[in-house]
Design a protein with these regions (language model features):
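Structure-specific DNA junction-binding interface
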Residues: 1-103
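Accessory alpha-helical DNA-binding modules that contact the DNA backbone or grooves
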Residues: 106-120, 132-159
Length: 159
């Protein structure tokens, strides 16, 4: 008997977007000679992707599409610099909406680390957080953790 990597012999290998549950639409573009393409971020992993759309009726910028969907072609990754101008303008609002839609997952980042050095290091990974701010965040967090972004903002003085 040969060892396996957790997949049956006749199972297809898992794709990079198989665990994604939603797409949040950043932009809709017309494609030549026909059809449309949407640029999106995936949820929960926040990949930037694009997909051909069979029917743009009901597809709106900023709204989420549940996956899997028969109306979409395959997903392919897009670099941030390759997004259309309108999609780049929409990305901050879409990321905020995705975070708000799954608060527990994202607040968990602040509460995940157990010992002091891991908490300190995790906070230092955030953009704009230096040593003194990371120490302040660790002390403000305490053992109980936070339950909302408002608590984090208030305790740590983050804008």
């Amino acid at each position: 008997m040969q060892p396996t990597d957790g997949q049956e012999a006749d199972e297809e290998p898992k794709g990079p977007y198989d665990d994604e549950t939603h797409l949040r639409v950043l932009g809709i573009q017309e494609r030549r000679p026909m059809g449309h393409e949407i640029q999106c971020i995936t949820e929960p992993s926040l990949y930037i992707v694009r997909s051909r759309v069979n029917d743009v009726n009901g597809v709106e910028i900023g709204k989420a599409i549940t996956l899997p969907s028969d109306h979409l072609g395959p997903l392919s990754e897009v670099r941030l610099k390759d997004l259309s101008g309108s999609a780049q303008q929409e990305i901050v609002a879409a990321l905020s909406a995705s975070v708000i839609a799954d608060l527990d997952r994202h607040i968990g980042f602040y509460n995940r680390a157990n010992n002091l050095s891991l908490k300190f290091h995790a906070f230092q990974l955030l953009p704009g957080i230096g040593n003194s701010k990371a120490i302040q965040m660790v002390q403000a967090r305490g053992l109980a953790g936070w339950s909302s972004f408002e608590e984090i903002d208030e305790a740590c003085g983050i804008d």
